[in-house]
């Protein structure tokens, strides 16, 4: 199984892992490919670690105590004392605000998917959105970004206190929004095109003269982002389909950073990415907010939200059901917010 829990919430992941252990007791052998170390440690009897196409370590979990730190060291080729880069937040005034945002289902107009959500983010702030699968996080992000999801969308979006038009993706981009999709292969990249072409895709005017693409400018821009984001490739002519998951994700982020957004919305930014590349992506995220921009981060990995965000909203069933400052947040408190709202809905 290749990344079997990548799109599952914690409860469903737990059920799948329990099923694997039950199958093991029945004599069934399972091979799991995963970046989630806690899951591998829970179910694996042995672990083979692959880096750059080669097997670099073999761990027998039945004969030795295997720690996550040891796995990480083998994966990245060095010790990693911290999973997240040190941050010195410099949070300013409100930069981005959404008020009373409502979205109906695209095929069932009577069904409201997003129910009067109001959120904001300040300059230099990373704001997380936590929630279970199906809570409406991705639908919220897509509906804000050019109304690319849903029908009968209403509410107000503002940047720097001024209402902006997000009625199309082009208008959303022109007004300072960018959205990194949760599905980079399906919607984030042209896999048969080069790093260069993908980097410039959302901002062709930035590398064109009178509607004609300037190849030198396009190549120069792609090389700048390749160097800045440490994209590992032969050159910028390499097809993105031949890159690792982490490097593909960096290309997607490059594409949107080239549009110079004020607000960067990241939907599952490290899904299917190894530990070393995750750290590099976290560093990129921190660099973006250090420039005075803000980031909205949607993630199913609570440790990621707790490790990177300054503030966390909690969503459930299309509503905001909780809000925490980083210093007050933990996994238990977030889950309590979700479960409490679920109980209220059922009463």
Where is each model-derived feature located?
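Glycine-rich phosphate-binding loops of nucleotide-dependent enzymes
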Residues: 1-347
């Amino acid at each position: 199984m290749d990344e079997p829990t990548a799109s599952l919430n914690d409860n469903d992941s737990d059920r799948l892992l329990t099923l694997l252990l039950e199958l093991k007791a029945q004599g069934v052998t399972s091979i799991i490919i995963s970046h989630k170390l806690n899951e591998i440690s829970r179910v694996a009897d042995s672990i083979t670690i692959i880096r750059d196409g080669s097997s670099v370590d073999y761990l027998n979990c039945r004969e030795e105590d295997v720690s996550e730190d040891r796995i990480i060291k083998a994966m990245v080729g060095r010790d990693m004392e911290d999973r997240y880069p040190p941050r010195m937040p410099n949070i300013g005034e409100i930069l981005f605000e959404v008020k009373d945002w409502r979205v109906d289902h695209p095929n069932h107009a009577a069904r409201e998917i997003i129910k009067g959500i109001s959120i904001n983010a300040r300059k230099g702030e990373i704001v997380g959105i936590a929630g279970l699968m199906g809570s409406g996080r991705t639908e919220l992000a897509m509906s804000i970004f050019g109304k690319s999801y849903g029908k009968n969308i209403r509410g107000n979006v503002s940047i720097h206190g001024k209402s902006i038009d997000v009625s199309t993706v082009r208008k959303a981009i022109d007004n300072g929004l960018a959205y990194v999709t949760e599905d980079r292969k399906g919607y984030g990249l042209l896999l048969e095109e080069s790093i260069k072409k993908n980097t410039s895709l959302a901002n062709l005017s930035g590398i064109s003269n009178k509607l004609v693409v300037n190849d030198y400018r396009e190549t120069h821009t792609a090389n700048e982002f390749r160097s800045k984001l440490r994209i590992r490739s032969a050159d910028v002519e390499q097809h993105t389909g031949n890159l690792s998951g982490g490097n593909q994700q960096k290309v997607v982020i490059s594409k949107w950073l080239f549009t110079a957004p004020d607000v960067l919305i990241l939907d599952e930014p490290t899904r299917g990415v190894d530990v070393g590349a995750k750290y590099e992506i976290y560093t990129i995220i921190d660099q973006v907010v250090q420039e005075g921009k803000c980031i909205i981060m949607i993630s199913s990995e609570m440790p990621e939200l707790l490790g990177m965000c300054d503030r966390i909203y909690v969503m459930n069933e299309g509503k905001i059901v909780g809000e925490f400052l980083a210093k007050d947040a933990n996994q238990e408190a977030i889950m309590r917010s979700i479960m409490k709202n679920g109980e209220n809905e059922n009463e």
